[in-house]
A protein has these predicted regions:
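Short, acidic/hydrophobic/Gly-rich beta-strand patch recurrent on exposed beta strands
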Residues: 17-23, 30, 84-90, 95-96
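A short, compositionally biased micro-patch
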Residues: 79, 88-90, 100, 108
Length: 115
């Protein structure tokens, strides 16, 4: 989890699109429920599952993902099936991907990647 400030809230038919700023990075999330106490300018903690993160060596184009964070792999543990790593950039978090994906990307500690 990391701290962020809400900079935009769009709502239509009970669905909320929320813009955040965290560490100078603009992020966006879509939510089915949102507390009525949250407003533009509210400070919040943002969290997501470590399995919800995609990693790439290059900027992605032609995909529906809006969030892109530049950073570095600080630690990496490669198992037979899963790979856990620590991603650090302007915000930091843990990532869980398949060992096969980590090997295909030839990921190593110290590599710069996009999440």
């Amino acid at each position: 989890m990391f701290r962020a400030r809400i900079n935009e809230i769009l709502q239509k038919d009970g669905i909320h699109s929320v813009g955040f700023i965290a560490g100078g990075i603009k992020l966006r999330g879509v939510f089915l429920q949102l507390s009525s106490e949250l407003k533009v300018g509210s400070e919040v903690y943002v969290g997501f599952k470590s399995t919800d993160v995609l990693l790439s060596r290059e900027a992605l184009s032609g995909v529906s993902s809006e969030n892109e964070i530049h950073g570095k792999i600080m630690s990496l543990s490669l198992g037979e099936i899963l790979c856990t790593l620590r991603f650090e950039g302007k915000i930091s978090f843990d990532v869980l991907i398949s060992a096969h994906s980590a090997q295909e990307l030839a990921l190593r500690e110290g590599d710069e990647v996009l999440a």
